[in-house]
Amino acid sequence: MNAIVDTGYLVALLNRNDEHHDWATGLAEKLTLPLLTSEAVLAETAFHLQSSTYVLKLLQEQVLQVAFECVSHLEHLQDLAIGYADRHPDFADLCLIRMSELYPRHVVVTVDDDFRVYRRNKRQAIPLLSPPKK
């Protein structure tokens, strides 16, 4: 399965103490490499893990691929930021919404419930993989 990955998934995958770690590791076996993401997601992930080491290793091993250059999509990102201003999306979320438009055959893997509200191409639900609700 082709996937675009969000910060929460990567943190859960790499942090054994994360509440979604078992879900993330089980899902990892089903995802096709490389997993697509943005630099914003990588920065957030390194911040939450308090280390860049794991992120860099996943890039070097081609588990992750940066497949989005934000400067090429600034106008669209701005439109998304304005359209979802009431939800206060972070920059990484805006990038992933746009990536889901650019890679329509990929699912977004996230623990973020806001992606249930976000839409690609203004009206289409974004295909998601998220942990089950407890």
Positions of PLM-derived features:
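A secondary-structure boundary/capping signal
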Residues: 6-7, 38, 111
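Metal-dependent nucleic-acid phosphoesterase active-site entry motif
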Residues: 1-18
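PIN-domain endoribonuclease scaffold, especially VapC-family toxins
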Residues: 3, 22-88, 98, 102-106, ...
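Low-complexity, intrinsically disordered Gly/Pro/Thr-rich segments
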Residues: 112-116
